[in-house]
């Protein structure tokens, strides 16, 4: 095959040579007639140099790659061609076997129920089927009915369409078998030979060979009948010895049993063999096809199983032991030590289990039908009477063989070592070899890995030992010159790790001068034997050191990058939280603005005067100090005049304890007017926010003008920014409203409100004044509310004269 491949590849190489150098050869054709030859020889020599071809420098490297690809494709094509040829041959053999061979109406080849690879031993399976120890491959029926007639059963068994019950197709018509005559019986008896059990196997093989139907059977006129010396039974000793030593191939053929094809008889007890077999069909519980009742039976639970399903069951592939799994063949070891050695780190392949009861060592038994058809072995003495008629054969077999199948199941299970049991290992005898090959392969891989680890360990050990020796006594030549023993070198080799590391660094830094000193001082000594190995180890260590430094730098860079990323994430998170807080503050500002309009409704509706007064006074007594702020109505000039350069900024604890408040810009008088107009136009009942104000937090910050910066609040300084609490509006008509006066006048009570605020801890409220009604607006000076306890919120009270008349239908408020 190699020569043919070389011959096939030569034309392509020469043609590519000509194509590749056509321009050069044509250009130099007129110069020298030998130019082409020298050029071809030079290219051939360059391409054939092994030192250049390994680097891919040769001129024919491209051609070599193309040749390898072509060769690889040819190998694949040859493999595909071989597989296709085997498949075609297998199909032909299957068709021939189904056409010419059968065993009691069954076949010796599979019927295509499973399309996977057939990895069972076909020769062993064939032998077991011919010996009637394993059921043949019956043809399975997809459907079956007990009411089918004989020709319907025949059509189903032959794979033909099932005809109607009252119609018999021409191909299914048959005639009853003719009765056997006396002449036929006499001729049959002449072909039979009574088996003699006292003969040896060699004589039995000769007798079986003479009775094989493939050879000419002896006739009454044959030499065997006449008894002459030319008969095979009367040949000389020389002929016998010559026949024994003549052919090795012939001896191998004679060693096996001979198959005999019984006379073709398509009837059993007057019925067609298909009708006799399939009239009591049984379903296989695995493939769900209907077969004759003569199926295999499991040895453990006596369940039926067809042969096609049986040959698919096998041992698992070799694998490491799992969950205490033991090796089955280890039980046959001679001693416990051998069994333990076989279990240590070895692959196992447990026996196949029964698909029904999951008992290991799966095996089947088979009870053949009470007749014989097809192939038999000539050496089987019990099959000699089968040459007779079907009726006589069935009667004789009933006495020679076990009784036929009965409806009663077997009561006990059979052992896996029973002679009648066929296990899955029997039809796959190479399972032990496969397991041994897998174990050897695993052992080779383990040995290779162990060798690699050992080599690496020895290299590291030798390198450390060399470094320690270099640190203590210098080079190996110096050690030999000074007469240092091997024991001392071994003791130096096994130093402490710190000493070895120091020796390693010292030797790396002073390797040049030390080498020069050793060469100068020991010029008459032999060169060190492991210098090249030491250099390789040094190079390897340098590479490892550089790799370690690179990995360290990379890890540091990665850590720094992660820290930067975390810092960016934290900054984004804080920015997002600040935006959320600002947004929430704006929402609370709008909410408190609505609350101010609802609180001002109290003054515009006289019907809610007393009730609001009483409820607000009661609420004001229970609340903490500093929660009430009145609406700012001071002119912008006054506010700006009293404001200090550092405006008020409310601390966080004060913001958490302060009620809902709203701060209006000092210069926005239009906004205050709008708020008052809304309070007059919407006379709705107000809830005074005595509940919601206690649960709400700081309302909103001041939308201050650019010239009013915010600053930290100083407790000792006077308040400069007006703060408002709309609960104090309800306190305008406070507890003093319970009197009998018809008209109350509130004005100029800043000092009293200051005293009340500091004493009771509630918001400053306006007290009642003497009876004269207010005629105008009298602004009062701004007073700072003194803090009481933990009330840090500064408050300003600007009182306005408010006249409330019970008798008047409307409340008159002068602003």
From Swiss-Prot:
Chain residue ranges for the region called Disordered: 1-82, 161-188, 200-266, 317-348, 387-416, 461-497, 514-534, 556-720, 736-780
Segments crossing the lipid bilayer: none
Entry keyword Cytoplasm: yes
Superkingdom of the organism of origin: Eukaryota
GO cellular component: cytoplasm
Chain intervals with Polar residues compositional bias: 1-30, 224-233, 461-471, 482-497
Compositional bias annotation for Basic and acidic residues: 34-44, 61-82, 172-188, 317-326, 556-585, 736-750
Low complexity bias (residue ranges): 200-223, 388-404, 635-647, 668-677, 691-704, 751-767
InterPro entries recorded: Sip5/DA2
Localisation: Cytoplasm
UniProt keyword terms in alphabetical order: Cytoplasm
Family matches, as PANTHER family: PROTEIN SIP5 (PTHR31315:SF1)
Entry function: May negatively regulate the snf1 kinase.
Family of this protein: Belongs to the SIP5 family.
Protein name, per record: Protein sip5
């Amino acid at each position: 095959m190699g020569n043919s491949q070389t011959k096939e590849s030569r034309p392509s190489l020469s043609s590519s040579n000509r194509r590749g150098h056509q321009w050069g050869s044509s250009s130099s054709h007129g110069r020298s007639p030998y130019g082409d030859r020298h050029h071809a020889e030079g290219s051939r020599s360059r391409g054939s140099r092994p030192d250049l071809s390994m680097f891919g420098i040769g001129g024919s490297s491209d051609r070599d790659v193309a040749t390898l690809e072509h060769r690889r494709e040819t190998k694949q094509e040859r493999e595909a061609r071989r597989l296709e040829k085997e498949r075609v041959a297998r199909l032909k053999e299957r068709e021939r076997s189904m056409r010419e061979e059968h065993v009691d109406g069954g076949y010796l080849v599979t019927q295509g129920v499973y399309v996977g690879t057939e990895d069972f031993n076909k020769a062993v399976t064939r032998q077991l089927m011919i010996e009637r120890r394993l059921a043949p491959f019956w043809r399975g029926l997809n459907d079956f009915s007990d009411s089918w007639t004989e020709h319907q059963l025949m059509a189903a068994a032959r794979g033909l369409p099932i005809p109607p019950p009252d119609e018999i197709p021409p191909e299914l018509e048959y005639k009853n078998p003719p009765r056997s005559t006396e002449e036929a019986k006499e001729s049959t008896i002449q072909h039979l030979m009574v088996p003699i059990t006292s003969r040896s196997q060699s004589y039995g093989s000769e007798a079986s060979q003479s009775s094989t139907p493939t050879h000419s059977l002896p006739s009454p006129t044959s030499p065997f009948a006449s008894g002459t010396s030319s008969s095979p039974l009367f040949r000389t000793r020389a002929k016998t010895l010559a026949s024994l030593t003549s052919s090795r191939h012939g001896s191998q053929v004679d060693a096996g049993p001979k198959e005999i094809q019984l006379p073709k008889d398509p009837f059993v007890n007057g019925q067609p063999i298909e009708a006799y077999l399939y009239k009591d069909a049984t379903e296989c519980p695995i493939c769900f096809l209907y077969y004759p009742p003569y199926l295999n039976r499991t040895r453990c639970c006596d369940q039926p199983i067809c042969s096609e399903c049986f040959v698919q069951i096998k041992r698992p592939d070799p694998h490491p032991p799992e969950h205490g799994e033991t090796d089955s063949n280890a039980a046959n070891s001679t001693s416990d030590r051998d069994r333990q050695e076989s279990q240590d780190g070895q692959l196992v392949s447990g026996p196949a289990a029964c698909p029904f009861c999951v008992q290991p060592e799966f095996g089947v038994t088979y009870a053949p039908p009470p007749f014989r058809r097809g192939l038999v072995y000539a050496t089987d003495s019990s099959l000699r009477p089968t040459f007779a008629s079907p009726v006589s054969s069935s009667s004789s077999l009933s006495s020679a063989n076990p009784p036929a199948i009965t409806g009663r199941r077997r009561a006990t299970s059979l052992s896996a070592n029973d002679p009648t049991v066929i296990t899955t290992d029997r039809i796959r005898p190479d399972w032990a070899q496969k397991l041994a090959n897998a174990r050897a392969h695993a052992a080779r891989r383990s040995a290779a890995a162990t060798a690699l680890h050992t080599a690496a360990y020895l290299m590291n050990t030798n390198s450390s030992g060399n470094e320690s020796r270099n640190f203590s006594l210098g080079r190996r030549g110096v050690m030999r010159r000074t007469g240092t023993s091997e024991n001392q070198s071994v003791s130096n080799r096994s130093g402490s790790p710190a000493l070895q590391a120091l020796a390693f660094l010292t030797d790396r830094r002073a390797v040049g001068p030390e080498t020069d000193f050793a060469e100068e001082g020991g010029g008459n000594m032999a060169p060190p034997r492991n210098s090249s190995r030491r250099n390789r180890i040094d190079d390897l260590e340098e590479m490892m050191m550089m790799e370690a430094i690179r990995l360290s730098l990379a890890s540091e860079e990665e850590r720094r990058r992660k820290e930067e990323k975390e810092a960016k994430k934290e900054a984004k998170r804080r920015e997002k939280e600040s935006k959320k807080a600002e947004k929430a503050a704006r929402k609370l500002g709008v909410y408190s603005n609505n609350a101010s309009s609802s609180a001002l409704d109290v003054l515009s509706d006289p019907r809610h005067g007393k009730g609001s007064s009483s409820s607000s006074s009661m609420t004001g007594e229970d609340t903490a100090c500093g929660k009430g702020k009145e609406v700012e109505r001071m002119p912008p000039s006054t506010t700006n005049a009293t404001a200090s350069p550092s405006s008020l900024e409310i601390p966080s604890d004060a913001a958490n304890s302060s009620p809902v408040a709203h701060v209006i810009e000092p210069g926005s008088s239009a906004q205050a007017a709008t708020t008052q107009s809304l309070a007059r136009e919407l006379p709705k009942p107000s809830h005074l926010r005595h509940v919601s104000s206690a649960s709400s937090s700081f309302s909103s910050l001041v939308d201050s003008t650019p010239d009013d910066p915010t600053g930290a609040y100083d407790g000792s300084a006077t308040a400069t920014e007006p703060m408002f609490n709309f609960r104090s509006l309800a306190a305008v008509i406070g507890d003093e409203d319970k009197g009998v006066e018809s008209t109350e006048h509130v004005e100029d009570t800043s000092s009293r409100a200051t005293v009340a605020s500091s004493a009771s801890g509630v918001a400053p409220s306006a007290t009642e004044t003497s009876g004269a009604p207010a005629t105008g607006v009298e602004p009062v000076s701004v007073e700072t509310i003194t803090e009481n306890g933990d009330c840090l919120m500064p408050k300003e009270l600007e009182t306005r004269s408010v006249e409330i008349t019970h008798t008047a239908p409307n409340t008159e408020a002068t602003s």
